Amino acid sequence: MKPALTLHDRTLKLNRFPIRKIETLQAWDAADEYLINHTHDMELDPQRPILILNDSFGALSCWFAERANVTTVTDSFVAKQGCIANLTANQLPSVNIIDCLAELPKNPQLVLIKLPKNNRLLTWQLQQLCHLLPEDCRVIGAAKVKDIHTSTLKLCDKYLGETKTSLAVKKARLVFIKPNASLAKPMPEAKAWDVPEHGIRLSNHANVFSGESLDIGARLLLNHIPQDFKYKDIIDLGCGNGVIGIKAARRNPQAKITCVDESFMAAASCTENAKQNLEAPEQLTAIVTDCLADIEHSSADLVLCNPPFHQQTTITDHIAWQMFCDAKQVLRPKGELIVIGNRQLGYDDKLKRLFGNVEIIAQNDKFIVYQSVK
C-alpha cells in the first residue's frame, strides 16, 4: 500500500479513515490520478466554485484545496472525516464539505464526479446538477473501466447532457458531460414501499442500502427482535432506512432507540420513517457517525446489527469487526449483541473470540442470526 500520491512534482500523504495499524488499501485510485492529470493545466477562476462529488477519502479535495474554491459533496461520514484528516495532515486549507441532500453552491465552473456504483444515487446527483449548472461548466466523471457500464452513460446522457468517454488509462476512464438545462426534471421523491407483514411503510433516499426493497437479511432479523422491559437503551447499528430500529421501538415502547449509520441519506430516511411509523417518533433518534464512535461506553442494553461488507467501492470485513468491537464497548454488563450475517462470513468465530460466547438464535439457507452477551 502506497501512503503517498505523487504527481506533477507534488506529493500528498493520504490515508483511509479510520487509520488502521496494518492497511492494505490505498486512499485513492487510478481514476483520481486520471482526473488530476487531465485537469492539471486547466485555468480555474479562484472566485467560482468547483464541485467534487463522492471523493472517497479526500484525494481530489486535497489536490484542489489550494487551487480553487472547493465544495465536496458526500453521503459518507467516513469519507468526510477522511477528507478532513487528510487536509489537516497535508497542512492544506479547509474545503466546504456538504452532504448529498444539501443545496449546492451556484455557478460552478467545474464538476468532478467519482461515479458511484449505485445508479439511484447517480441519477439523483445528475438531476440535482442539471438544475444548477451553467452552460460553460465542465463536468468530468471518473471510475474504473469495469464500473462504467452502458447504463451509466445512458443515465448521464438522459439526466444531464451529451456524454462522451475517454480512452482507458490504468484501467480507469473519464466521462465528459455537456450540461443541458433543457433536460432538467423535478427532483424525484424518496422511494417508498411497504413491509406489509410488519405494518411498516419505508421511505428511502437515493443512497440508502437496499432502498428499493427489504433485504433478505433484515427480513429474517425482523422476526427475531427481542421484547423485554429490561431493555432501556437499544441501538440499531448500521440502520439504513431504520426498519430494524422501528420494529425494536414497537416491541419495546419503554426503550430509547438510537439508530446509527455513516450515510447522511440513511439517517434522514430513518428519521422520516420514525415519524411515519411510530406513535411517539421522539422515541427514536438517528445519528450519523463512524460505527459507535460517538456513543458513550456502557450505555446500551441491546445492539442490533446488520453489518455491511464494503466501504465505498471496496469489499472488506473490517467494518463488521469494528462494529462488533464498538458494540462490546457501548454495551452494559450482560448487554446483548444480535447480529445477522451471511452464513459464509463466519461471524460466529469473530463473536466468540471477542465476547467469549455466541449462540445461533435463527437461521435459513443464506443467513444466521447470532447473539453474544457481554
UniProtKB/Swiss-Prot annotation:
| Gene3D superfamilies found in the cross-reference section | Vaccinia Virus protein VP39
The entry lists its GO molecular-function terms as: 23S rRNA (guanine(1835)-N(2))-methyltransferase activity; nucleic acid binding
Q: What subcellular locations does the record give?
A: Cytoplasm
Q: Which InterPro entries match?
A: DNA_methylase_N6_adenine_CS, rRNA_m2G-MeTrfase_RlmG, RsmC/RlmG, SAM-dependent_MTases_sf, Small_mtfrase_dom
Enzyme Commission code(s) on record = 2.1.1.174
List UniProt keywords, sorted A-Z: Cytoplasm, Methyltransferase, rRNA processing, S-adenosyl-L-methionine, Transferase
Q: Does the keyword rRNA processing apply?
A: yes
Q: Name one GO cellular component term.
A: cytoplasm
Q: Does the keyword Methyltransferase apply?
A: yes
What reaction does this enzyme carry out catalytically? guanosine(1835) in 23S rRNA + S-adenosyl-L-methionine = N(2)-methylguanosine(1835) in 23S rRNA + S-adenosyl-L-homocysteine + H(+)
> Which family is annotated?
Belongs to the methyltransferase superfamily. RlmG family.
Q: What does this protein do?
A: Specifically methylates the guanine in position 1835 (m2G1835) of 23S rRNA.
- List the protein's name: Ribosomal RNA large subunit methyltransferase G
**What species was this sequence derived from?**
Photobacterium profundum (strain SS9)
